C-alpha cells in the first residue's frame, strides 16, 4: 500500500519511482482516489526531474492497462496487427490512404484516431465530412470490420486508457503538456491499447509541427521508439517535414476529396505520396509483410495501381455506415463551400517560407476546426491547390484556392494566407520530406 503524497515526495526529491508505485498512482487517477492537485503535483515533478527509461515504460504500460487492451487472437487473423500515429500537422491526410494500402498488402489496422487539436487537423473530423460515417461502432462491429475489411478508423472510447484522459486534462491546465515522458506515455497508452504487433510513428518537424524544434522532435521520436519497444511492440519512427502543408489541401471535405483522388490515381501530390509510401513501407517491414524496402514499395504500388487500396477504402466507408458508392460518387456526397475563389500573392516570385501553423489556424478561423471542444465544424471550408515551397507564383498561379462560407470569411482567410506565405525573387532550398528513420 502506498500513499500518493509519498510517491510525489519521492519524485520531487529526484528519485526514480518503482513500477508498483507508478501503477498505484495511475490506478488512483482512474479510480478517482488521487486528487487533481496530486495529479498536477506529480506532473510538475516529472516535468522538472524527467523519468528514466524503465519509469517511462512503467508509466506507459500502467496507463495502457488502466482500461481495456484489445486482443485479436480470437479472430485468427492471417496477418499482423499494425498501426501508424502522427504527431499532427496541416494537410496530413496520410491515414486515409495508408490504412487501406497496408490492409490491401495483408495487414490489419485498428486505427484509433483523434479530433483536430489547435492548428492540426483531426482524422475523425475529416471522416465525419462523409455523410453517415460512424466513428463509434460497437466493439463487435469494430472487430468484424477489422476481420473482413482489414482497416477501421474509429474514435477513442472511454474504455481505452481512461487514466490518460484525466491525466491529460490536468496537464492541459497546469503547463505540463510539453514534457517528453508525459507526451510519450499519453500517445503510447492509447496506441498500445490497440493490441498491436507493430507501430510506426510519424513525428513532424518544422513550422506546423507539435514540437517547436528539430531537436525536440527528434528527442520525442527517440523516446517513443524506446518506450514502445520496451513495452514489447516493434516500433520505428520517421521524422517528416511540416514546413509546408503536406497535401495540396487543408480542411475536412477537401482533404477527403484529395485522399480519394490519391487512391484512385486521379491526382497524387508528390510530397504526400513520398510520406505515405515511406510510412507504409515501415509498416510492411515491421509487420513482416515484406522482406525489404524494394519488395514493400512494389507491393504498395501494385495495390494503388490495381485499385485494391481504393476498393478497401470504399468498403471501410460502407462498413462504418457511409455511402456504399462513396469512392465512385464522392463529389455527390462531400459538402462544398458557398464561395471558392483563388488568393494571389501581392507580387510575383518564389515561395520561400510558409508559416504552416498559421495556415492551419486560418482553416480553424473559417470554421474548419475547433477553438474549444464544444464547437461545431463546417466540413466544407478549407484551402486547396496550395502553392509549394520553391514554386513560382504570379497572376496566373495563386497561393491557394480558399473555400469559405461567406465573402467576409474569405477576406479574412485571404489576409491570413498572404501573411503566412513568404514570396521572394530567388527560390530557397527545399527541405527533405523524410529527415531520418529511428529504430532504437
UniProtKB/Swiss-Prot annotation:
TM spans (from-to): none
Check the record and name the SMART domains matching this protein: PYNP_C (SM00941)
Show the catalytic activity.
thymidine + phosphate = 2-deoxy-alpha-D-ribose 1-phosphate + thymine
Q: Which Pfam families match?
A: Glycos_trans_3N, Glycos_transf_3, PYNP_C
What are the GO MF terms of this UniProt record?
1,4-alpha-oligoglucan phosphorylase activity; thymidine phosphorylase activity
- A GO CC term? cytosol
User: Is Glycosyltransferase among this UniProt entry's keywords?
Assistant: yes
Keywords of this protein's UniProt record, alphabetized? Glycosyltransferase, Transferase
| Enzyme Commission designation | 2.4.2.4
Q: Which GO terms describe its biological process?
A: pyrimidine nucleobase metabolic process; thymidine metabolic process
- Return the SUPFAM superfamilies for the record: Nucleoside phosphorylase/phosphoribosyltransferase catalytic domain, Nucleoside phosphorylase/phosphoribosyltransferase N-terminal domain, Pyrimidine nucleoside phosphorylase C-terminal domain
- Which pathway does the UniProt entry assign to this protein? Pyrimidine metabolism; dTMP biosynthesis via salvage pathway; dTMP from thymine: step 1/2
InterPro entries from the xrefs? Glycosyl_Trfase_fam3, Glycosyl_Trfase_fam3_N_dom, Glycosyl_Trfase_fam3_N_dom_sf, Nuc_phospho_transferase, PYNP-like_C_sf, PYNP_C, Pyrmidine_PPas_bac/euk, Pyrmidine_PPase_CS
According to its UniProt entry, what is the function of this protein?
The enzymes which catalyze the reversible phosphorolysis of pyrimidine nucleosides are involved in the degradation of these compounds and in their utilization as carbon and energy sources, or in the rescue of pyrimidine bases for nucleotide synthesis.
- Subunit structure, interactors included: Homodimer.
User: What does the sequence similarity comment in the record state about its family?
Assistant: Belongs to the thymidine/pyrimidine-nucleoside phosphorylase family.
Q: What is this protein called?
A: Thymidine phosphorylase
Q: What organism does the UniProt record list as the source?
A: Cronobacter sakazakii (strain ATCC BAA-894)
Amino acid at each position: 500500500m502506498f500513499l500518493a503524497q509519498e510517491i510525489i515526495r519521492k519524485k520531487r526529491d529526484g528519485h526514480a519511482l518503482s513500477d508498483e508505485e507508478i501503477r498505484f498512482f495511475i490506478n488512483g487517477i482512474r479510480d478517482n482516489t488521487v486528487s487533481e492537485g496530486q495529479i498536477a503535483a506529480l506532473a510538475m515533478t516529472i516535468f522538472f526531474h524527467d523519468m528514466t527509461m524503465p519509469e517511462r515504460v512503467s508509466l506507459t504500460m500502467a496507463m495502457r492497462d488502466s482500461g481495456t487492451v484489445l486482443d485479436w487472437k480470437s479472430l485468427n487473423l492471417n496477418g499482423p496487427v499494425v498501426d501508424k500515429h502522427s504527431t499532427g500537422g496541416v494537410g496530413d491526410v496520410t491515414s486515409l490512404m495508408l490504412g487501406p494500402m497496408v490492409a490491401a498488402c495483408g495487414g490489419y489496422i485498428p486505427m484509433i484516431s483523434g479530433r483536430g487539436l489547435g492548428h492540426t487537423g483531426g482524422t475523425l473530423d475529416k471522416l465525419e465530412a462523409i455523410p453517415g460515417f460512424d466513428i463509434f461502432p460497437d466493439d463487435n462491429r469494430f472487430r468484424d470490420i477489422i476481420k473482413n475489411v482489414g482497416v477501421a478508423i474509429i474514435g477513442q472510447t472511454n474504455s481505452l486508457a481512461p487514466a490518460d484522459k484525466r491525466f491529460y486534462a490536468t496537464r492541459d491546465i497546469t503547463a505540463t503538456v510539453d514534457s517528453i515522458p508525459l507526451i510519450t506515455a499519453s500517445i503510447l497508452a492509447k496506441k498500445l491499447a490497440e493490441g498491436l504487433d507493430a507501430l510506426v510513428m510519424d513525428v513532424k518537424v518544422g513550422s506546423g509541427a507539435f514540437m517547436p524544434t528539430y531537436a525536440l522532435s527528434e528527442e520525442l521520436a527517440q523516446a517513443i521508439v524506446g518506450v514502445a519497444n520496451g513495452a514489447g511492440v516493434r516500433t520505428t519512427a520517421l521524422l517528416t517535414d511540416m514546413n509546408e502543408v503536406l497535401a495540396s489541401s487543408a480542411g475536412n471535405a477537401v482533404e477527403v476529396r484529395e485522399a480519394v483522388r490519391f487512391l484512385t490515381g486521379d491526382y497524387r501530390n508528390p510530397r504526400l505520396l513520398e510520406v505515405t509510401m515511406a510510412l507504409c513501407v515501415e509498416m510492411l517491414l515491421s509487420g513482416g509483410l515484406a522482406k525489404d524496402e524494394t519488395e514493400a514499395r512494389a507491393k504498395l504500388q501494385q495495390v494503388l495501381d490495381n485499385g485494391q487500396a481504393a476498393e478497401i477504402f470504399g468498403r471501410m466507408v460502407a462498413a462504418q455506415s457511409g455511402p456504399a458508392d462513396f469512392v465512385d460518387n464522392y463529389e455527390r456526397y462531400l459538402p462544398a463551400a458557398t464561395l471558392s475563389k483563388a488568393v494571389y500573392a501581392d507580387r510575383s516570385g518564389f515561395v520561400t517560407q510558409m508559416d504552416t501553423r498559421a495556415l492551419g489556424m486560418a482553416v480553424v478561423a473559417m470554421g474548419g476546426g475547433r477553438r474549444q471542444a464544444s464547437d461545431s465544424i463546417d466540413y466544407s471550408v478549407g484551402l486547396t491547390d496550395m502553392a509549394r515551397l520553391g514554386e513560382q507564383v504570379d497572376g496566373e498561379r495563386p497561393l491557394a484556392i480558399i473555400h469559405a462560407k461567406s465573402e467576409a470569411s474569405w477576406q479574412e482567410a485571404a489576409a491570413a494566407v498572404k501573411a503566412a506565405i513568404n514570396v521572394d525573387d530567388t527560390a530557397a532550398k527545399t527541405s527533405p520530406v523524410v529527415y531520418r528513420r529511428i529504430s532504437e
